[in-house]
């Protein structure tokens, strides 16, 4: 608390009060709770990110009656996980959104079913993708109506050692969608932020090509030095620390050296 009086978090999160428990979204509430898409989330404790256990499009025949929600986008009053200040202010960088694409498809249809649909070239895969894109483009417009410096997109694409799908399939099926979303943001004069956990080395060149200004990734599992060798100076990295080993077991001096090494490798 003392340091926050002198050094504010760069997105201004500490200017917002914590979200009251009664206002937690469905995926952060204990028990089973339904979100605006009709996905039912299950969590064992309040504040613990839950799992989607009932997916409205697990049976594709339900798609004919599925209704896409119309979410309002308003300046946030509270913070939870990642707060987003609105408005130009020297005290913070105003970054809006946490807009997912592949992850929302999984929550609606199911992880295995989405991948199987794509692999087999099912009409359902293209229908869900195209409608998901239309939904997200409309959502981006709502964020662009507010005063932000950048818009944040997020999809976890990596496992510990590789992409979840082949880079070629990612480029043919998903890349055009990211292109459309990123172009809308960039043409409005805003920065594009993209979050993706896991090993995503294969698509970092694509994200840079598409205009991502900031990539929030886990460079440790890809090799910090190799990520820096290939991409240092081409994009801003907002990288994760080594939570699996150093941040869990390392002594203070080891942690300090780890952080310094990240700046040397990627900064």
For each feature predicted by the language model, list its residue ranges.
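Glycine/serine-rich loop-strand microenvironments at binding/catalytic pocket rims
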Residues: 13, 30, 35-39, 226-231, ...
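Short, glycine/charge-rich beta-strand/loop segments that flank catalytic centers
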Residues: 19-30, 70, 97-102
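Intrinsic-disorder/low-complexity regions
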Residues: 5, 9, 17, 32-34, ...
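Active-site loop segments of alpha/beta catalytic cores
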Residues: 1, 43, 65-267
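Catalytic domains of carbohydrate-active enzymes, especially glycoside hydrolases
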Residues: 2-22, 142-148
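A contiguous, low-structure linker/loop signature
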Residues: 26-75, 87-92
């Amino acid at each position: 608390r003392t340091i926050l009086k002198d050094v504010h978090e760069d997105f201004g999160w500490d200017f917002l009060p914590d979200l009251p428990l009664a206002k937690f979204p469905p995926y952060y509430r204990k028990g089973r709770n339904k979100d605006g898409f009709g996905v039912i989330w299950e969590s064992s404790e309040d504040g613990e990110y839950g799992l989607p256990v009932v997916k409205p499009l697990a049976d594709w025949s339900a798609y004919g009656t599925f209704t896409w929600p119309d979410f309002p986008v308003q300046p946030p009053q509270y913070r939870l996980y990642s707060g987003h200040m609105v408005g130009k202010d020297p005290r913070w960088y105003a970054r809006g959104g946490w807009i997912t694409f592949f992850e929302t498809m999984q929550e609606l249809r199911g992880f295995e079913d989405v991948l199987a649909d794509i692999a087999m070239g099912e009409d359902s895969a293209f229908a869900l993708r195209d409608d998901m894109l239309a939904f997200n483009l409309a959502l981006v417009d709502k964020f662009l109506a507010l005063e932000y410096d950048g818009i944040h997109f997020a999809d976890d694409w990596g496992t510990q050692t590789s992409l979840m799908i082949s880079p070629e399939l990612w480029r043919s099926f998903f890349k055009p969608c990211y292109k459309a979303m990123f172009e809308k943001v960039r043409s409005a004069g805003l920065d594009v932020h993209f979050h993706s956990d896991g090993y995503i080395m294969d698509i970092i060149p694509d994200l840079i090509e598409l205009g991502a200004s900031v990539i929030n990734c886990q460079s440790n599992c890809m090799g910090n030095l190799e990520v820096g060798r290939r991409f240092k100076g081409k994009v801003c990295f907002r990288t994760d620390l080594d939570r699996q080993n150093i941040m869990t077991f390392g002594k203070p001096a080891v942690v300090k050296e780890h952080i310094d090494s990240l700046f040397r490798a990627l900064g």
